């Protein structure tokens, strides 16, 4: 029995290991991978490997793995990657696994600067990446530095601006807060919707020359073929939609494209190597097939996948709504518990205050009782003193009468008696004055005693009302694409041809009517403009790249991806081919 061959396949988020037989085909290995990851939208993907010469190449599905020029390692190394890109991610990427794989691959390409992304857009994209990883922003959990270990921005952007890690985090966090309530998978899709409007998204670039020998770039993407000047990969100069192309072929390094317009000449260019032409042909065929498929009614399989995806999304939304509802209920219960605890504390404090007031009133009552007793004693003393004085006065009166009688009887000792009389008269006057004072004093004590008695009665009434008040209520209880493939390594097979059919397709060039995602959202557009102005203040102009300069010129001229697409397809096919030859 032949010895099995170990194979390692790296997806964007996993490493898979298989043992295959020497006669296993590329398709059998591919099918094993997609089955393992649960992927049904297989037409976008392929298996990539590095050949014996160090070139990155796509595995042929119709050939045995062992018959292809895979670098000899143990295990054999492959990457599972998107080979073709959708025109509109929101319309075409159905399964969540497909969306995630595209999100991770596009994010890596942007961070590695394989796709040019301006700084302000890079910050917006980073915020969607953060939402997809961390979910909703929560200031209790996401403290300062929560993004310190995440790679979120291209190195070029970091080096061009005099901003600290904390300042970058603050800008990303501001947008992260705005994505509250967005599902993680929805944030990946929002990332892709912004990213697909970047000029270099989904484009495979190949160095070519026209008949004059001018060095140019050929861009092959989901919408057609575009020609770029050698120093500008951002702005295509001439475009040919797939619907204009009838046949593609190559002979050695010469590549020929025959337009549907019979009056137009062939579109001819030259690649540096035969293997490049083979790769261009395979990409053209795959992209053309997908371009035409999109413009036809969905197959039963795609319809079923879309229905299933809608059902799964609806179910997730229901689950999330239920979760949010439970969360709100829990928050309400916690708030109610806090409110009850607070009211309980307030009632306890009120009870404590009432107890203090009761004790204070009790002390005041005792003090007033003591004071009333003292006043009563004073009143009694004053009364006794007044009675004593009254007795003395009466005694003096009696003495006076006796003396008067004695004076009448004894005229002979008149002078002596007169003196005694005067003395007693003066004494009587003094005693009367003292009596009057004591009577006034007794009256005053009498008033004070009455006032104290009234205060005492009042305090007794207050104490009685406090003591008889009902106790505070207890707190309520807590409620808690057929592949016509060509072997890039087979140098003998130096020519090939493919017919590109456009039968049964309506509205060929609908892509020319598109606008970018930011143009659809005025608020995001203004935020991006504001952030762009802000970042410009911190930018080191000496570190600008060629792409930065080109992007700035495009923005200044009002050129967007789809506006440029409309412009480079203007005129008939012949005019554009003539323009290409003149470059």
Curated annotation (Swiss-Prot):
Subcellular location: Cell membrane; Cytoplasm, Cytoskeleton
Transmembrane segments: none
Segments of skewed composition (Pro residues): 469-480
PANTHER family reported for this sequence: MERLIN/MOESIN/EZRIN/RADIXIN
Protein known as: Radixin
Biological-process GO terms, alphabetical: actin filament capping; positive regulation of early endosome to late endosome transport; positive regulation of protein localization to early endosome; regulation of cell shape; regulation of organelle assembly
Bias (Basic and acidic residues) ranges: 436-447, 455-464, 483-492, 506-525
Keywords of the record: Actin capping, Actin-binding, Cell membrane, Cytoplasm, Cytoskeleton, Membrane
Gene3D superfamilies: 1.20.5.450, 1.20.80.10, 6.10.360.10, Phosphatidylinositol 3-kinase Catalytic Subunit, Chain A, domain 1 (3.10.20.90), Pleckstrin-homology domain (PH domain)/Phosphotyrosine-binding domain (PTB) (2.30.29.30)
Recorded name of the encoding gene: RDX
Job of this protein: Probably plays a crucial role in the binding of the barbed end of actin filaments to the plasma membrane.
UniProt xrefs under CDD domains: FERM_B-lobe (cd14473), FERM_C_ERM (cd13194), FERM_F1_ERM (cd17187)
Any one GO cellular component localisation term in the record: apical part of cell
First and last residue of the signal peptide: none
Mode of membrane association: Peripheral membrane protein
Binding site for a 1,2-diacyl-sn-glycero-3-phospho-(1D-myo-inositol): 60-63, 278
Alphabetical list of InterPro entries matching this protein: Band_41_domain, ERM, ERM_C_dom, ERM_FERM_C, ERM_helical, Ez/rad/moesin-like, FERM/acyl-CoA-bd_prot_sf, FERM_2
Main location: membrane
Source organism: Gallus gallus (Chicken)
GO MF assignments: actin binding; cell adhesion molecule binding
Region feature Disordered, mapped onto this chain: 310-336, 436-527
